[in-house]
Amino acid sequence: FKGNPVSLEDSSGSQGYLQDASFSTTDDTGGGGVDFASGTEALLVGVFNGAFFVDNTTNKPTFANSVAAAQRFGTNPNTNSTDGIGFVNDDPHQEYIIKADAAVTRAAHGQCGNVNDFTATDAKNGQSTITLDVGALAEDHMFRIVRSAEDPENEDLTAAGANVVVAFNSSANLYLK
C-alpha cells in the first residue's frame, strides 16, 4: 500500500503491527475503507510512506514506496527475522491531497469522509489510487475536508476527480483523540 491510511493491528495498539485501513476489512477484522468508524475501529496512526525489507527473490535490502500484500520478505541476515520496517507519516496535523470520487459541494467542506476500498487491481506502479468517498460523509470518518487543493488541472469541485486537501479527523487519529 502507498499513501493509504494506517492503523495499528488492534484497537488497544498492543500488537504494534501496521495494517492498511483503506481495505474494506482490516487485519483486526474491523471495518476499513468506506466502513471505517472511529468509535469501533483501531484508530489511525498516520499514512504509509514506504518500507524497508529484505527482498525474498534477490536477498538484497530494499526500500519501496509501495508494498503489495503478496510481497514476501526474505530473512535479514543481521536479525534472522523476516519482518519489514514500515515508515509512516505520523504527524497528526499533516494535510494530504486526495482525489474526490464525486463533486465536492460547499456544504461538504469541513465534513469527514473515508477513502474508498482499495483492491490489488487498483495498483498503478506504486502510486496511490485511493479516492475520498464524498457520497457518505459522517463525523466518525477518517479525514476532514479542508479546502480545494487549487491544482489547476484538477480543481473543478463540481466534477469527480478534483484534488482536495484533507486532514485527520481528530476522533479518528490515535494522537488527537
Region annotations inferred by a language model:
Residues 1-177:
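Surface-exposed, low-hydrophobicity beta-strand/loop segments enriched in small/polar/acidic residues
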